[in-house]
């Protein structure tokens, strides 16, 4: 399989937010969507370079319950980005 990266992203969406599922289905290029329950799904794909998916994956921040990838670089980069965003924009107890 030419060293494909396997990626899985579990996404939760609230009541009335089915548009998230529709968006995921519409925008995915490869892979499949598994429905886990009424408000949770998993996107699964095997791609040549999962790091190229990071900008798209980031658009689901706040809804991602779990992210796994055979390329640990992708997972580490995603969570490091979250830590950087929290350091820049959040975490202050006196924030407005």
Regions found by a protein language model. Give the residues of each.
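Polybasic (Lys/Arg-rich)
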Residues: 1-96
């Amino acid at each position: 399989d030419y060293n494909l990266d396997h990626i899985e992203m579990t996404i939760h969406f609230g009541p009335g937010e089915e548009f998230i599922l529709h968006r995921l289905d519409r925008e995915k290029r490869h892979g499949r969507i598994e429905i886990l329950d009424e408000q949770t799904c998993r996107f699964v794909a095997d791609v040549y370079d999962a790091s190229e998916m990071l900008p798209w994956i980031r658009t689901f921040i706040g809804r991602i319950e779990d992210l796994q990838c055979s390329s640990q670089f992708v997972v580490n980069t995603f969570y490091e980005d979250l830590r950087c965003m929290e350091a820049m924009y959040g975490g202050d107890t006196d924030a407005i």
